[in-house]
A protein has these predicted regions:
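C-terminal structural segments of small proteins and small subunits
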Residues: 52-84
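Glycine- and other small-residue-rich loops at beta-strand/loop junctions that grip anionic moieties
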Residues: 5, 31-32, 51
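Ribosome large-subunit tunnel/peptidyl-transferase-proximal elements
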Residues: 1-25, 35
Length: 84
């Protein structure tokens, strides 16, 4: 997950969903402690759009990996990023 700090990305539910729907998502990282309904919705959307999903243990770890000081439920590396 070290690549998340330097990759061109978006963090959070709304921005991640938008990136997936607009075809800009290359890889989605989902925290496993997200509400199950949201987790299922995102996994289904990624499957439909052919976007790879990587699960992360918890939101705190994902936030840290993104280089932010708060928890993150999900993050999305954008397709034009060279770091993945």
């Amino acid at each position: 997950m070290e690549e998340l700090k330097n990759a061109r990305k978006v963090v959070g539910l709304n921005q991640t969903v938008r990136a997936i729907e607009e075809g800009q998502a290359k890889m989605v990282y989902l925290a496993e402690d997200v509400e199950p309904k949201i987790l299922q919705r995102l996994e289904q959307l990624c499957k439909e759009r052919g976007v790879s999903v990587t699960k992360v243990a918890d939101m705190k770890q994902l936030g840290k990996a993104c280089g932010i000081d708060v928890k993150a439920a999900m993050a999305c590396v954008l397709a034009d990023s060279d770091n993945i």
